[in-house]
Regions:
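Generic serine detector
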Residues: 1, 17, 36, 75-76, ...
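Active-site-proximal specificity loops/subdomain of glycosyltransferases
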Residues: 2-92, 101
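Conserved catalytic core of nucleotide-sugar-dependent glycosyltransferases
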Residues: 64-65, 97-196
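Residues that form generic nucleotide/phosphate-binding pockets
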Residues: 78, 183, 187, 204
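Charged phosphate-binding loop/patch that engages nucleotide di/tri-phosphates or the phosphate backbone
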Residues: 196-207
Length: 207
């Protein structure tokens, strides 16, 4: 959306003190408002002159989607900073997606030449309101595979991803009506941030 967002981990590091030695926190300091300088391929990013899976050039997408794509793809620099090697299994997720740990207990199914998507139970509004049982959530592949594409392309490539059933959870629009409205005004899908949708927020949260 272009709105500034808090650095939640940075502000709450003390709550994660038990695991801080395992966490590499990479901050994208600035996201451009113009991507005309990125029409050609750059490290870990798409060529904005290329076409997305739906037939639109990245540079022709609404600026909010270009910015979201940049931010998502830039996370690969954090993976690099963590010291990933080609054979490492990389899981990329949005913050509200949790992969089922049982998926990772036995990796005999994992083929490093493929990439995978975790099909998740998606819960909206409340922890017990199941909205969808096949949400395409976390993506899994090797670092060798990921660094030769982008995080965003990897996430959009549904056709070639191997599906893992019952593989996690996706929680969205939880909390009270104010949290709901905050998300609507903060993420890239600002087409949902309309008077009509906002007027129904209280009803959706309560019912």
């Amino acid at each position: 959306s272009g709105n500034e967002k808090p650095l939640y981990y940075q502000e709450n590091k003390d709550r994660f003190s038990k695991w801080n030695d395992k966490i590499v926190h990479y901050i994208t300091e600035e996201i451009p408002n113009d991507f005309s300088h990125m029409l050609e391929k750059t490290k870990y990013h798409v060529a904005y002159n290329d076409v997305d899976p739906y037939g639109t050039k990245f540079i022709d997408l609404p600026i909010r989607f270009q910015r979201a794509l940049y931010n998502r793809n830039n996370s690969s620099f954090g993976i690099e900073k963590a010291g990933a090697t080609d054979d490492d299994l990389i899981i990329t997720s949005d913050a509200d997606e949790i992969i089922n740990p049982y998926v990772l207990e036995d990796l005999s199914w994992f083929d490093p030449n493929n990439h995978y998507v975790a099909l998740c139970n998606a819960y909206y509004y409340k922890l017990n309101f199941l909205y969808q049982d096949d949400w395409m959530g976390s993506r899994l592949c090797t670092w060798k595979h990921l660094k030769n594409t982008t995080v965003g392309q990897h996430r959009q490539d549904h056709a070639n991803a191997y599906k893992i059933e019952n593989a996690g959870w996706h929680f969205s629009f939880l909390g009270n009506a104010e949290n709901f409205k905050l998300k609507l005004s903060s993420y890239e899908h600002t087409e949902n941030n309309t008077a009509e949708v906002l007027s129904n927020v209280e009803e959706k949260v309560e019912n």
